[in-house]
């Protein structure tokens, strides 16, 4: 498989006004996988406080900077990582009936504040699966994916990344949004249909061989 090395750099220049400024920047995942390997992050600038940390309550890495007093506020944060191409050949997929779901995957079947699995979410998921006559986890995932592609759209007017409130989206019938909305819509419907699913966000840093 082809391996590539990338450097992702933030260059931040905050306004000089006010007595205090704080900065949070998301960083690449430091938990190496079979297709992504972190080689660390470095920073430079004039922050009063600077540290590499994790988002509270999660394992997601971040950079935190704080400036006390007015004046220039700059920070440059660089992260280096390697990626390895991967493909999954679904032609050879076979369902193992009665196979146990790994403990680390079970949490991807649970409801969250933004991903309720009852009410309209469950009703919609079961309707999609029934209409597609989907039985295996792969068939269900494919049916839900196709439904999301056919019925949702990216709305450039959505603020930020969207709220990911799929219950409100389904109740209103407005399935437009941005990444958090569309990703969470698929994840919620998949979980409601009994298929483990999770959000996985990232930054596109190269051309895709598949899209």
Regions found by a protein language model. Give the residues of each.
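Intrinsically disordered, low-complexity N-terminal segments that are enriched in acidic
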Residues: 1-87
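Conserved aromatic-histidine-acidic binding/catalytic patches
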Residues: 11, 132, 174-178
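Proline-rich low-complexity regions
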Residues: 26-28, 102, 196
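Eukaryote-specific, cytoplasm-facing alpha-helical/coiled-coil scaffolding segments in long proteins
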Residues: 37, 173-174
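Acidic low-complexity segments
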Residues: 74-173
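Solvent-exposed loop/turn segments at secondary-structure junctions
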Residues: 83-85, 176, 204-207
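Active-site nucleophilic cysteine motif
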Residues: 137-140, 144, 175-190
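Hydrophobic/aromatic-rich core segments of domains that either
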Residues: 184-211
């Amino acid at each position: 498989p082809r391996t590539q090395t990338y450097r992702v750099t933030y260059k931040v220049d905050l306004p000089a006004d006010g007595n205090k400024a704080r900065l949070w920047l998301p960083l690449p995942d430091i938990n190496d996988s079979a297709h992504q390997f972190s080689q660390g992050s470095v920073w430079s600038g004039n922050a009063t406080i600077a540290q590499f940390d994790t988002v509270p309550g999660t394992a997601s890495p971040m950079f935190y900077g704080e400036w006390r007093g007015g004046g220039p506020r700059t920070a440059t944060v660089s992260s280096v990582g390697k990626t390895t191409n991967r493909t999954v050949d679904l032609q050879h997929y076979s369902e193992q009936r009665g196979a146990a779901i790994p403990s680390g995957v079970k949490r991807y079947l649970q409801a969250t504040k933004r991903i309720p699995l009852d009410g309209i979410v469950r009703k919609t998921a079961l309707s999609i699966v029934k209409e597609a006559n989907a039985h295996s986890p792969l068939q269900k995932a494919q049916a839900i994916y196709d439904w999301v592609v056919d019925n949702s759209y990216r709305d450039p007017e959505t603020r930020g990344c969207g709220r990911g409130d799929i219950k409100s989206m389904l109740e209103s019938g407005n399935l437009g949004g941005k990444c958090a909305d569309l990703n969470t819509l698929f994840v919620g419907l998949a979980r409601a249909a009994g298929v483990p699913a999770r959000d996985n966000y990232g930054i596109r840093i190269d051309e895709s061989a598949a899209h």
